[in-house]
């Protein structure tokens, strides 16, 4: 068969609804509030065809730059051959959700502020940079009365 060039080509599983999640869209989807500067994940919902993003934006993360009654404008990076372009797309709110990618950072900022405040009260210095995991502590290995066995490689023999 020939290769069709439709907008939804190859989206059989991409835009399909999860198991037991078909039918009416939950109202919580419409109750979420989006503001300028919010970071959102784009995920096309097959039950709503209006305002659906193109399949190339499915799974991408962008920043909200415009908010209207039913949709939001999002700036998303898209790779076109060798360059990355900042694309502005309009997507209805059924097809987006707040991204969790920034949550850990914001949590760390709050913790650091708390540490700074406590350190200032005590008049001490505090380490705020994240440190890599240190090497494990030294420990003895139990042999349960057995003698450790020395392993040696077998010498190479050329067989012709």
UniProtKB/Swiss-Prot annotation:
Domain of life: Eukaryota
S-S pairs: none
Pfam families xrefs: Ribosomal_L21e
Organism: Capra hircus
Protein name in the entry: Large ribosomal subunit protein eL21
Localization of this protein: Cytoplasm, Cytosol; Cytoplasm; Endoplasmic reticulum
Family under the similarity heading: Belongs to the eukaryotic ribosomal protein eL21 family.
Keywords: Cytoplasm, Endoplasmic reticulum, Ribonucleoprotein, Ribosomal protein
GO molecular function, one term: structural constituent of ribosome
PROSITE patterns per the UniProt record, alphabetical: RIBOSOMAL_L21E
Region (Disordered): 112-145
Gene Ontology BP term (one): translation
Upper classification of the organism: Eukaryota, Metazoa, Chordata, Craniata, Vertebrata
């Amino acid at each position: 068969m020939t290769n069709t060039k439709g907008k939804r080509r190859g989206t059989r599983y991409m835009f399909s609804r999860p198991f037991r999640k078909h039918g009416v869209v939950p109202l919580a989807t419409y109750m979420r509030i989006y503001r300028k500067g919010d970071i959102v994940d784009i995920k096309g919902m097959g039950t709503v065809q209006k305002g659906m993003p193109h399949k190339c934006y499915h799974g991408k993360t962008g920043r909200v730059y415009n908010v209207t009654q039913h949709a939001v404008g999002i700036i998303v990076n898209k790779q076109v051959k060798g360059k990355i372009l900042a694309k502005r797309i309009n997507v209805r709110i059924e097809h987006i959700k707040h991204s969790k990618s920034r949550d850990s950072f914001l949590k760390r900022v709050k913790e650091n502020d708390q540490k700074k405040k406590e350190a200032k009260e005590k008049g001490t210095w505090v380490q705020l940079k994240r440190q890599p995991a240190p090497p494990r502590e030294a420990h003895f290995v139990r042999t349960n009365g057995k003698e450790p066995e020395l392993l040696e490689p077998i010498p190479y023999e050329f067989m012709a």
